[in-house]
């Protein structure tokens, strides 16, 4: 099918054919496709002659350098695949130009041999714009065709001074103020990428994401922005800000108090904690489980022989589980027997995180955060893993938690701020987070003490421990503090942690 029309393109593209040993170079996509089509026609003609000699040996292999694709189904699969190589070549050129415009960035350091590895193509590129359903084998022509729909879309009046364009994609009702926004939106339907890394071949939806891909590969001494929550480092403040959104819990389980940052996390929680469905069943016994990983671990128990062996030279250790071999390797061959976990209350050290968990619960009477099944530990500058004392909640979730607390509060409850222990739940302003566990261990305390008015953005709400009828204190994660729009720096967090613990 001929191209549905030219679109503005960047100048001076060096489109180099990588079919076999071909060295053809041009600057226009139309000329590039014509050239590659000749390769395809010659290749397909040769494949037909081989098929006549041996009909059982029918296959369609791609000769693009560093590719290795082979289709046993039809020549149409190969045609779509090779045309995608052409489109990918253009994106890599655009990536090269974007990289050359950033004098402070170094090239990608990932494996150059993956530069021509492209995703599996669909059976066809189908336009689902209303009353269209055009089909293409060439992704370039398909994306241009969809662009034409956006450019020809008529404005609709929703009021006297307000006109919008509506997306005509099947099942979509989105509207936009201008055609450019509609064009960008359509990429979410077509999965179109606009730039690729010239080194590793990775494709991206915009230049910003591509340049982030490069910046993430900077050396450690250039990664000057550190996450105060998990200690990961980043090259730019914006990368850090994007990363920290993944720490903010925006979604709450409707069946318990578990909160999480992503819809996918909530789905997993619902499946593992509130569903009785166990679709993965063992063929050797009555065991069933909720995921494939657990089933594979279980199947190892049916093996009479050790399925896993230590690959260290002259070591004969073997075990029926991979985790046992990994643990053996860390302790015996890596010398990882030194304690890495330290209690933040009494400084006692442990070699394993679950031992510290038992210590915190029995020695210091810590409770898991309501709706959460375990403690989380964070590596500090001295190399020790200590209890993570900060959890970020969105404003909406915090208000929901506070409402539940107020509805169940006991006005006669005696408060004792010296007994405060636990997690600071930082309230973070902003919209929903990006797209992507056991039974509750006691409620968050019922009493609240307000250190300031709730309308004050700097107020802190202390959820303190209560004394039951037997005179036993129930120590829980106890501090909610509302901060400004971004999570606090390390220094501010440390100050609040010390205050929360009464230090």
From Swiss-Prot:
Keyword set for this entry? Activator, DNA-binding, Metal-binding, Nucleus, Repeat, Repressor, Transcription, Transcription regulation, Ubl conjugation, Zinc, Zinc-finger
Q: Where are the zinc fingers (C2H2-type)?
A: 17-39, 125-149, 165-189, 195-217, 225-247, 251-274, 280-302, 308-333, 341-364
Outline the segment boundaries, as ranges, of region: Disordered. Answer: 481-503
List the SUPFAM superfamilies hit by this protein, alphabetically. Answer: beta-beta-alpha zinc fingers
Metal-binding keyword on record: yes
Localization terms from the record: Nucleus
Give start-end ranges for the coiled-coil region(s). none
Q: Where is this region: Required for activation of histone H4 transcription and contributes to DNA-binding?
A: 370-403
Is the Metal-binding keyword given for this protein? yes
The known PTMs are summarized as:
Ubiquitinated. Ubiquitination may lead to proteasome-mediated degradation.
Q: Looking at the UniProt record for this protein, which Gene Ontology cellular component terms does it annotate, in alphabetical order?
A: Cajal body; nucleoplasm; nucleus
Looking at the Swiss-Prot or TrEMBL record, what is one Pfam family this protein matches?
zf-C2H2
According to the UniProt record, where is the region Interaction with NPAT? 369-503
Q: Which domain of life is it from?
A: Eukaryota
GO MF terms listed in the record are: chromatin binding; DNA binding; DNA-binding transcription activator activity, RNA polymerase II-specific; DNA-binding transcription factor activity; DNA-binding transcription repressor activity, RNA polymerase II-specific; enzyme binding; histone binding; RNA polymerase II cis-regulatory region sequence-specific DNA binding
- Where do Basic and acidic residues bias regions lie? 493-503
List the SMART domains. Answer: ZnF_C2H2
Q: Which cysteines are joined by disulfide bonds?
A: none
Complex formation: Binds MBD2 and a histone deacetylase complex. Interacts with NPAT.
Q: What role is this protein assigned?
A: Transcriptional repressor that binds to the consensus sequence 5'-CGGACGTT-3' and to the RB1 promoter. Transcriptional activator that promotes histone H4 gene transcription at the G1/S phase transition in conjunction with NPAT. Also activates transcription of the ATM and PRKDC genes. Autoregulates its expression by associating with its own promoter.
The protein's name in its UniProt record? Histone H4 transcription factor
Give the species: Mus musculus (Mouse)
